Amino acid sequence: VTDTSIGPLQIGESVADASFLSVLELRGLDPRWEADGVSPITLTEATTVLALTWSDGVVMAGDRRATAGNYIAHSRVRKVYEADRHSAVAISGTAGMAVELIKLFRTELEHYEKIEGSTLSLDGKANFLARMIRGNLSMAFQGLVVIPLFCGYDKRQEKGRLFSYDVVGGRYDELNFATTGSGGAEARSFLKSVWNEDLTREQALGAAVEAIVAAAEEDSATGGLDLKRGILPNVLVVTADGVEEISDEDLAAIAQPILDGRP
């Protein structure tokens, strides 16, 4: 059955800008999360994610645990995603909504590139993600919160950059490192103790993995490392060459001496 009430965009039809969301809004198809009234439901939540700069880019990492109240709902949740060729995004908060928001964000970046023939600047990407978080404000007031981290390689400034956000869509440039989620304070404290501007790739990867371990030791909602079962953080490295995902084999090699050295 074909629905003829909503047809394709016609040639010459006005669109506000080269935004996929604007196209959806024009057709009345934009995603809307609404909850009239508050009911006592238990939601699956993603927990600790982090990012830190190093000499040639940014490392972004996230643990794999998702919780529903005091219950461990999942032990292999992916929280760090490639946004496009030179940026990545990590999620914390209400897991289902966060994953959908990131899918839409990635589609938005792809749509913009197809329409404009060029990519958004890194600041433009960060600003658009802030706009999307702000669009979720009514749900945030009812406890359905999504707070991501965003990072990328800025070709104009020739360095890695990272951004944090608050629940109302405020965007903040972070110079060295950023964390969010239930174990964010512990991870941040560890990164503060080890970060320096001359970190190598290997040192940054080690710091990211050990920060997850430190957070898991203090926060029950953060999943630690389990080499026997193959449960390891998912980690991305962003440089001028693009986004690289670190394999479980490489992460295990990084993690083993860290775990051996913990008291």
For the regions a language model picked out, list residue spans one by one.
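Long, low-complexity N-terminal extensions
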Residues: 1-263
